[in-house]
């Protein structure tokens, strides 16, 4: 963190070229605010993207950035972090870019636990290429590439992250700026691979895809904000809660059948066993609320630290410590 106090303006760059009403606008505002509150100097940040609407984001942040090729944000970010561990790196991908052609890089970056703030902007559609179904589009979704409806099940980003032994998973919705800022800050402060799924709208090709939680009123009824150490309550007046039932979960109403707040599950984001956390991450309407906030956050050694330690260990055992020293051994000649 820098001694200088930064403002949102320090992180802004250029005029975003997205459709009016695109969820990318709201997310970008949250990212600017999160960066300002984190206080990391712009020259110590790199924003790295692949290809897609959301992948234009590096142009609109006044930091270092790479607009790479399709699906390769996590791969390039891995190299950048290992080469310069002091950088704060934000790989940003859409659901198509990150989970289709980039899916392999995504799961291995998570598995290796590289210290990256991995953002997945999920609007369940390919937007830049004008409306084809993506790996997160729902079964039966009608699009230009599935005119009669898709006949395949979608990926759940949480399931991929958890399956790759992810240590941090959080979810927010782009239009909820205050909550998004807090989630982004938590991701940045976590040491290791942080995966944040951002639910966002595509007003042109998949309008209303997250309609149930798109408004404040909708989120009160259909979403639950999880906070570590606090009871899992939701509803306009926090009148509903989550309890365990067998190996699953159930929604209960406080006051009915003698149920009180003491009966409600307490969220433990730091539990090493991810069984309950994954159940929370996979909840869907209409039977369950959609989980928002930090769902899982546990500590583990990072890949970039392990690589740096290994290099120092090997150098300590070798006569020559770098390539230049090796070149200058024995007889040398200077050609003029």
Model feature map: region roles:
Residues 5-69:
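Active-site diphosphate/adenylate-binding microenvironment
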């Amino acid at each position: 963190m820098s001694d200088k106090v930064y403002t949102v303006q320090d992180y802004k760059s250029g005029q975003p070229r997205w459709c009016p009403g695109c969820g990318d606008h709201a997310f970008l505002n949250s990212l600017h605010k999160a960066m300002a509150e984190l206080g990391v100097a712009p020259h110590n940040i790199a924003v790295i993207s692949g290809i897609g609407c959301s992948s234009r984001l590096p142009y609109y942040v006044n930091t270092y950035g790479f607009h790479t090729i399709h699906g390769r944000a996590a791969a390039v970010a891995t190299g950048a972090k290992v080469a310069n561990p002091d950088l704060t790196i934000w790989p940003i991908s859409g659901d198509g870019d990150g989970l289709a052609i980039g899916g392999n890089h995504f799961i291995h970056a998570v598995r290796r636990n590289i210290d990256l703030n991995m953002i997945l902007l999920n609007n369940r559609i390919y937007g830049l290429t004008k409306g084809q179904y993506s790996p997160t589009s729902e079964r039966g979704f009608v699009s230009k590439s599935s005119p009669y409806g898709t006949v395949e099940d979608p990926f759940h980003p949480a399931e991929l992250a958890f399956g790759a032994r992810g240590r941090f998973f959080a979810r927010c919705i782009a239009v909820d700026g205050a909550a998004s800022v807090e989630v982004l800050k938590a991701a940045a402060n976590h040491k290791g691979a942080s995966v944040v799924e951002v639910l966002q709208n595509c007003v042109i090709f998949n309008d209303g895809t997250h309609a149930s939680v798109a408004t404040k009123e909708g989120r009160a009824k259909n979403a639950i904000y999880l906070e570590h150490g606090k009871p899992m309550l939701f509803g306009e007046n926090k009148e509903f809660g989550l309890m365990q039932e067998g190996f699953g979960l159930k929604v209960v109403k406080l006051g009915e059948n003698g149920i009180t707040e003491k009966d409600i599950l307490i969220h433990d984001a730091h539990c090493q066993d991810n069984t309950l956390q994954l159940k929370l991450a996979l909840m869907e309407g209409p039977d369950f609320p959609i989980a928002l906030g930090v769902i899982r956050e546990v500590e583990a050694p990072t890949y970039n630290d392990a690589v740096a330690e290994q290099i120092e260990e090997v150098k300590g055992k070798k006569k020559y410590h770098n390539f230049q020293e090796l070149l200058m051994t024995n007889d040398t000649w200077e050609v003029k």
